[in-house]
Amino acid sequence: MSKFVFVTGGVVSSIGKGIVAASLGRLLKSRGYSVSILKLDPYLNVDPGTMSPFQHGEVFVTEDGAETDLDLGHYERFTDTAMTRLNSVTTGSIYQAVINKERRGSYNGGTVQVIPHITGEIRERIHRVAANSNADIIITEIGGTVGDIESLPFLEAIREFKNDVNRNDVAYIHVTLLPFIKTSGEIKTKPTQHSVKELRSIGIQPDLLVCRSDKSINEGLKKKLSGFCGVNIKSVIEALDADSIYSVPLALKKEGLCKETLKYLELEDKECDLKNWEALIHNLRNPGDPIKVALVGKYIELGDAYLSVVEALRHACIEKKASLDLHWVSAEMIEKGSAETYLKEVDAIVVPGGFGNRGVNGKISAIKFAREKKIPFLGLCLGMQCAVIEWARNVANLPDASSSELNPDTPNPVIHLLPEQEDVVDLGGTMRLGVYPCRLTNNTTGKKLYDEDVIYERHRHRYEFNNYYKQSFLNSGYKISGTSPDGRLVELIELENHPYFLACQYHPEFLSRPGKPHPLFQGLIKASQEKLTQSN
């Protein structure tokens, strides 16, 4: 039977609950326990799939095609465990399920209320993850901040949850902030005391406090928090600001987070094996020469919009003992100026996914610059589509080529709508989503990098390469490195006579892990290092 850990946050938003949950997952897994982590998000959207990246950041896609919160990416990267659509729950999806049940008559004519029906549905979702994953420990992160109106149903649900199981099957962790007041030179505990008081008023007594701070917390402060918040002093965990999110598990291990959690769950504190993780942090803190990577996008004002891409680059740099020097380049600024102005000093160029016309011509200019100047290049999803358009216009004698998404009237739609998407009206959850197989072509860079005949990658798109133009592309020097097993869909392309020029229709960034970098990102960094060595 599974045990359950609930992670709440107080005082301020963006306190780091997701990293705490993911770090605890890593620590538990290092002790031999299986873990699954789910996120309860208190917004009314059914999922983040239709939300602006400026509002929500990246949409993380799971193996089974769910469009989820970016925290699920942290969960997967830290625990190296695949999550599913069950691991992402929103207020919108809960209300939708309850209303659908009411319409079907599932409540036998009863009055449908927040308590017990909404809270009951939330508890059911948590139990469903336990049943589906069969994990030893289920960690649940509750989005928002204690005191927010929209979080109340979730907090009530996790309060009720302890009645579904034995008390020693549940642990409550509250992540909070201890602000340092510069004028007085003091760390203040009062905001945390009030946050815990608010949590207690709902009926939840936290078992552990994880205290975020940029200053070290002495024993006196821990004793004070223990007394005012009713938490064992050993369960007051210091969480100092870290140099990297990947160093957080080691810091929390030192503070005893995992040991104390296991104590409340009455589970054995097994021997912890973090040798590989420690080696990872050593390489991270002792990098070699920097690699200047330009990320050319349309949402660069919010770095979280490309979170998995950045982490995948970081994983590859750690593996190759390089330092990541990331240059955020606005595709729209390239349109107003020139690609050379923004890209002449970089060692590699990445064009990530996206939607819509804005910034596309800037991306195409960046790709042309990478191709002509022999700069290692990787295109992802829309990045591949832009690479196809660039080649068609500048090499394959199709100057008016475009995508039917960007220009429905183009006479040469080298990128067109997938046939199964033609009658789709709704936006949410209707794209080609989730894992699909890709057969790699022999004697290609792609095949060499993966060293597999068939790979499985995650997708999120409606448009694809138009096979009507396949032969003209092949004749003009393009290589198709990977297709769907039936050969119908082009998934990976590359150029010969270039240090590294690959573009894929899928999202390889979702499968990159610390210590297990994705082959396409690893290949990009390696090619950049080799080019730098040759130029020196």
From Swiss-Prot:
Q: Which residues form the active site?
A: C381, H507, E509
Pathway where this protein functions: Pyrimidine metabolism; CTP biosynthesis via de novo pathway; CTP from UDP: step 2/2
Report domain Glutamine amidotransferase type-1 positions.
Answer: 292-534
- The UniProt annotation places L-glutamine binding at G354, L382, G383, M384, Q385, E405, R462
**Which residues are noted in the entry as ATP-binding?**
S14, I15, G16, K17, G18, I19, D71
Q: What GO molecular-function term can you cite, just one?
A: metal ion binding
EC number annotated for this UniProt entry: 6.3.4.2
* One Gene Ontology term, aspect cellular component: cytosol
Q: How is its activity regulated?
A: Allosterically activated by GTP, when glutamine is the substrate; GTP has no effect on the reaction when ammonia is the substrate. The allosteric effector GTP functions by stabilizing the protein conformation that binds the tetrahedral intermediate(s) formed during glutamine hydrolysis. Inhibited by the product CTP, via allosteric rather than competitive inhibition.
Q: Where is this region: Amidoligase domain?
A: 1-267
Pfam families given in the database record: CTP_synth_N, GATase
Binding positions (CTP)? S13, D148, I149, E150, K188, T189, K190, P191, T192, Q193, K224
Q: Which HAMAP family match?
A: PyrG
- Assembly and interactions? Homotetramer.
Note from the entry: CTPSs have evolved a hybrid strategy for distinguishing between UTP and CTP. The overlapping regions of the product feedback inhibitory and substrate sites recognize a common feature in both compounds, the triphosphate moiety. To differentiate isosteric substrate and product pyrimidine rings, an additional pocket far from the expected kinase/ligase catalytic site, specifically recognizes the cytosine and ribose portions of the product inhibitor.
Name this protein carries in UniProt = CTP synthase
